[in-house]
A protein has these predicted regions:
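Short N-terminal edge-element motif at the start of the domain
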Residues: 5-83
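Aromatic- and Lys/Arg-enriched surface recognition patch
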Residues: 73-157
């Protein structure tokens, strides 16, 4: 289940946005929307130094905790651990580094606005998807209280 918190004041945080933006049906989308991932500043420099380019694949992970619907409301299960879990991927189809091109061609993406104009990138997807939960996607080592202690899935071997 994916949703935006109705309690979060997005207007007060204009640079807060979906990134990666790979969920086609989460918002009303402009007709020219494509899945994309924006990076800027130090993160963009790190990706450049790592030679990340067309054809490479990003694996996306986040912190997740098991939930349940109680009395019609979604809530966390008491005592359920917070774990790092892979939730999606994106194969890079194009890398846009020119701010003017980003602003004109991808004006719907938050990285097209001025705060992101220093060392800015948008990675356009060739192919992407999200995953349904599977134990094989859990990065946090089983029975480990610290979520940052990982046991990499076998497909990393």
């Amino acid at each position: 289940m994916l949703f935006r918190s109705p309690d979060f004041d997005f207007e007060s945080y204009p640079t807060c946005h979906l990134d990666p933006d790979i969920y086609e049906d989460i918002d009303d989308r402009p007709v020219d929307w494509v899945p994309a991932f924006g990076q800027w500043g130090v993160a963009a420099t790190h990706l450049d130094k790592s030679c990340v380019d067309v054809g490479d694949i990003f694996l996306f992970y986040g912190m997740f905790r098991q939930t349940e619907i109680k009395n019609g409301k979604l809530s966390y299960i008491k005592g359920a651990p917070i774990r790092h879990i892979i939730y999606g991927y994106m194969e890079i189809g194009e890398v846009i580094k020119d701010d003017k091109e980003i602003a004109s061609k991808y004006n719907w993406h938050p990285h097209s606005i001025e705060p992101f104009y220093t060392n800015n990138r948008i990675y356009i997807s060739k192919k992407c998807s999200t995953f349904h939960y599977d134990d094989a996607l859990v990065l946090t080592q089983k029975d480990q209280p610290r979520r940052s202690v990982w046991q990499l899935p076998s497909f990393f071997a």
